[in-house]
A protein has these predicted regions:
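A short beta-alpha structural unit
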Residues: 36-40, 284, 318-329, 367-369, ...
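Active-site metal-coordination/substrate-binding segment of hydrolases
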Residues: 84-182, 208, 332-336, 346-347, ...
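Acidic-enriched catalytic cores of C-N bond-cleaving enzymes acting on peptides and small amides
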Residues: 214-219, 238-269, 288-363
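Zn-dependent metallopeptidase/amidohydrolase metal-coordination segment
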Residues: 28-31, 354, 361-374, 439-495
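Active-site-adjacent substrate-binding region
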Residues: 244, 251-267, 419-462
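His/Asp/Glu-rich mid-to-C-terminal helical/loop segments that flank catalytic regions of hydrolases
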Residues: 177, 242-259, 287-292, 336-343, ...
Length: 501
C-alpha cells in the first residue's frame, strides 16, 4: 500500500490559487474558498481525476499523510492536536462527484468546464447548472478542518469517495484496512438540524427491450416533448408525486396507440441519471400519412390532461409536438410491445415505512429511457429499507422485461444502514447541537442511499451519523446551498471534534 507524506507548507497552493471572485467574504471564509476552488473544475460522476488530484495536492502541500486509490478515492490523515493524541480517531467523509444537470439552453460542457457560481449572500447556486453542493460542501468543510491548526481535535481520517451518485462505486472500492476510526461523521445530508441514523438499501436495474429500426418511408414524422417538470432526487423527492418525463411519455404513447393504429416509435430519450426523477423527455413517432392534424390535436388535448393532473406538483409541465424527419422506426407491432412494457413497469412509491411516519419504505425510479439500434434501454434506481421488498421490486422489473422479450442486468447493490439504539457518538453530537443552537436535533432515517451502510460493512463496530447544511433541490438546476446554515454546520463539526478529545 502506497502512502505519501511531503514537506509541510503554511499556505497550500490550492488555497493560494483561489480567486474568490464570487464567494469572497462569505463565512466561514476558508470553507467557501475551498468550495469555490472545487467547483472550478469538472467533477461529474465518472470524471473525478482532476478533483481527486486537487485533494492530493492539498495533502502534499500541508505535509499530511495520504493515499490515492486507482478509482480516485482519496484518504488523508491528520494527527491529533496537542493533548488529544490518545483520543479515538474520527472519520470525516464525503464524496467528490456530482450530478451534472443543466438547463436546455446551457452551452457549458460539464465534462470539461467548472461551474459558474452565484450568490445573494444567503444562498449559493450555479448559473444554469446543478451546484454540486451534494457533496462538495462536505469536501470543502473537511479540507478547511484539515488546514486549520487552531482547532482542538482527535486524530482525523478524511475519506473522499468517488461516484456515489452512480452506484456508490467509490465506497464499494474503498480500502478500509488502514482506517482505525470507529466513529464516522458522514456529511452528505441536506437538512440542517436533522441527523440521519439509518438509510435504505438500493440497487440499479438496467433493462434492454430489443428492437430494430427499419425503413419508415412514406410516413409522417412527429417529435414529441414533455418538459417543465420539476424533477428531483429519487430518494429525497420521490414521495412528492412529481411527474416523471419518462413515465408521462409512456402514457402519451400508450394513449396515442389507441387512437392512431400503425404508429411506430422512432426515437425516445429521457433522463440522464437513474437516481434523478426525469424532468424532460423527447420522443419521435412515425404515423400513417394523413394523421398529422389529428395527432397535433390529440397532443394539445393531452397537454390539458397533464396540466390538470400535475397543477400542484409540476405547474409548468408542457407537452408539445412538431413535424420531424423519421427515416427509420420500430415496427408497429414491436412498438405496441415496447409501449406496453414501458407503461407496465413500476415507478414511484411502492410502500411507506411503518416505523417512521412519512418515510418512504420502498420505491423505484425510472430514471433513464433511451432508444437506439439495440432497442429500448430503461435504467431504474430501486430503494428499500427492507431487503426482501427491494428484491421483490427487482423481480417485477425482470418479469415485465421478460414478457416483452427483454433482459435485465442488475448492479450497484448496496446494503441499508440499521438504526443503532445506543450510540455515545450520536449523543455527543446531539448535545453539541443543543448547546450551540438551543434546539433539539431531529433524529431520522432516510429513503436516500448513503455510503454509511457500505462503510459499516467494511469496518466492524463502526458507529455513524450523517448530517449537513441546508441544501435544496439537489441534482437539479435549482440546487442551492444556504450560507448561514453552512456556517452553523461547520461550527457544529468543529465542536464535535473538540468534545471527542
Amino acid at each position: 500500500m502506497l502512502y505519501c507524506v511531503c514537506g509541510a507548507e503554511t499556505a497550500p497552493a490550492l488555497e493560494r490559487s483561489m480567486k474568490m471572485a464570487v464567494l469572497k467574504g462569505l463565512k466561514p471564509e476558508k470553507v467557501f474558498a475551498y468550495f469555490e476552488k472545487l467547483c472550478s473544475v469538472p467533477h461529474g460522476s465518472g470524471n473525478t481525476k482532476i478533483i481527486s488530484d486537487l485533494c492530493v495536492s492539498f495533502a502534499e502541500e500541508l505535509g499530511l499523510k495520504y493515499r490515492q486509490e486507482p478509482c480516485n478515492n482519496v484518504v488523508i490523515w491528520k494527527p491529533a492536536s496537542p493533548g488529544c493524541e490518545s483520543a479515538e480517531p474520527i472519520i470525516l467523509q464525503g464524496h467528490i462527484d456530482m450530478v451534472c444537470a443543466k438547463t436546455d439552453d446551457c452551452t457549458k460542457d460539464m465534462t470539461r468546464e467548472g461551474l459558474d457560481l452565484m450568490t445573494d449572500g444567503e444562498w449559493i447556486w450555479a448559473d444554469k447548472t446543478s451546484l454540486g453542493g451534494d457533496n462538495c460542501i462536505a469536501v470543502a468543510m473537511i479540507l478547511a478542518i484539515l488546514s486549520d491548526d487552531t482547532l482542538v481535535h482527535p486524530p482525523i481520517e478524511a475519506v473522499f469517495t468517488v461516484d456515489e451518485e452512480v452506484g456508490m462505486d467509490g465506497a464499494f472500492a474503498l480500502d478500509c484496512s488502514d482506517l482505525k476510526g470507529k466513529k464516522l461523521l458522514n456529511l452528505d445530508s441536506e437538512l440542517e438540524g436533522v441527523f440521519t441514523v439509518s438509510c435504505a438499501g438500493g440497487m440499479r436495474s438496467d433493462c434492454l427491450l430489443p428492437a430494430a429500426l427499419t425503413d419508415a418511408a412514406g410516413m409522417e414524422g412527429f417529435g414529441i416533448t414533455v418538459a417543465g417538470l420539476r424533477g428531483g432526487h429519487s430518494g429525497a423527492d420521490i414521495h412528492l408525486g412529481r411527474g416523471s418525463g419518462n413515465r408521462l411519455m409512456g402514457l402519451v404513447l400508450a394513449t396515442a396507440l389507441e387512437k392512431f393504429p400503425g404508429l411506430r416509435l422512432a426515437a425516445f430519450s429521457g433522463g440522464q441519471f437513474d437516481n434523478v426523477i426525469c424532468s424532460r423527455c423527447d420522443a419521435a413517432v412515425a404515423l400513417p400519412k394523413g394523421s398529422g392534424r389529428a395527432f397535433e390535436a390529440f397532443i394539445r388535448e393531452f397537454e390539458g390532461v397533464l396540466k390538470n393532473e400535475y397543477a400542484v406538483t409540476d405547474p409548468d409541465v408542457t407537452l408539445t409536438c412538431a413535424a420531424a424527419e423519421t427515416a427509420k422506426a420500430v415496427s408497429a407491432e414491436r412498438t405496441v410491445t415496447l409501449v406496453q412494457a414501458l407503461t407496465a413497469m413500476p415507478h414511484g412509491v411502492e410502500a411507506m415505512d411503518t416505523d417512521f411516519p412519512g418515510l418512504v419504505q420502498t420505491s423505484l425510479n425510472m430514471g433513464v429511457v433511451k432508444l437506439d439500434g439495440d432497442g429500448l434501454h430503461i435504467a431504474f434506481s430501486i430503494r428499500s429499507s427492507i431487503a426482501s421488498r427491494k428484491l421483490m421490486l427487482a423481480q417485477r422489473v425482470r418479469a415485465v422485461a421478460a414478457l416483452a422479450g427483454g433482459t435485465v442486468a442488475e448492479r450497484g447493490v448496496y446494503p441499508g444502514w440499521q438504526y443503532k439504539r445506543e450510540s455515545q457518538f450520536r449523543d455527543t453530537l446531539l448535545a453539541a447541537y443543543k448547546d450551540l443552537t438551543g434546539k433539539d436535533g431531529v433524529v431520522e432515517a432516510t429513503h436516500g442511499g448513503l455510503e454509511c451502510g457500505l462503510l459499516m460493512e467494511k469496518i466492524p463496530g463502526l458507529d455513524a451519523v450523517s448530517m449537513g447544511p441546508e441544501l435544496h433541490d439537489v441534482h437539479s438546476v435549482r440546487e442551492r446551498l444556504s450560507v448561514p446554515s453552512t456556517e452553523r454546520t461547520y461550527e457544529l463539526v468543529c465542536e464535535l471534534l473538540r468534545r471527542s478529545c
